[in-house]
Swiss-Prot record:
Organism listed in the record: Methanosarcina mazei (strain ATCC BAA-159 / DSM 3647 / Goe1 / Go1 / JCM 11833 / OCM 88)
Positions annotated as Sequence repeat: 7-84, 100-178
Domain of life: Archaea
Keywords of this entry: DNA-binding, Repeat, Transcription, Transcription regulation
Protein task: General factor that plays a role in the activation of archaeal genes transcribed by RNA polymerase. Binds specifically to the TATA box promoter element which lies close to the position of transcription initiation.
Gene Ontology process terms (BP): DNA-templated transcription initiation
Name under which the protein is recorded: TATA-box-binding protein 3
PANTHER family the record matches: TATA-BOX BINDING PROTEIN
Length: 185
């Protein structure tokens, strides 16, 4: 029963400048950008190649979300840096230190699971299961520090990883524990 992860989202952050004038950025023609400082303190900007969305703050910090790989997140941030440099911001770091904050991945065990049995077998230490609040079982893996959402369909969502290997290891740990308890058939 071989399962692998599929990366669904990478959240990365960086600092592209000492500060940004978001009003000036809007006036300079950043096409499709949204900024309403009363509702949210950052400017929202989306690109399609590679697909990503950015939150741009006056502090010069940028959060990139929506990429399907670390490479795409990095490429999207470089794309943004070049765009900003060309339209409004001369003092942009074109080689920023990009840090992955979170990776969300999915996996499928390809078998139905009895979440009540899993919750009882695992005890209360690393597991939360309240089906009247949330349909999935929440399993917290200590190392690597990831959270695995387990659904009765056998589908999993793994979040909190800083690299794909964290998510792969989280999946391996869950599969091993389920297998050791005789829960995978």
């Amino acid at each position: 029963m071989e399962s692998t992860i599929t990366i669904e989202n990478v959240v990365a952050s960086t600092r592209l400048a000492e500060d940004f004038d978001l009003e000036k950025m809007m006036e300079s023609g950043l096409e499709g950008a949204e900024y309403n400082k009363v509702k949210f303190p950052g400017l929202v900007y989306r690109i399609n190649n590679p697909k990503a969305a950015f939150l741009i703050f006056t502090s010069g910090k940028v959060v990139c979300t929506g990429s399907k790989s670390i490479g795409n997140a990095h490429a999207a941030i470089i794309n943004l840096a070049n765009t900003l440099k060309s339209i409004c911001c001369e003092k942009i770091d074109l080689e920023p230190d990009v840090r992955v904050q979170n990776i969300v991945a999915s996996a499928d065990l390809k078998t139905n699971l009895n979440l009540n049995t899993i919750a009882i077998a695992f005890g209360l230490e690393n597991v939360e299961y309240e089906p009247e609040v949330f349909p999935g079982l929440i399993y917290r893996v200590e190392a690597p520090k990831v959270v695995v959402l387990v659904f009765s369909s056998g589908k999993l969502v793994i979040t909190g990883g800083k690299c794909p290997e964290d998510c792969e290891e989280g999946l391996r740990i869950v599969k091993t524990e389920f297998d050791n308890l005789g829960l995978l058939y």
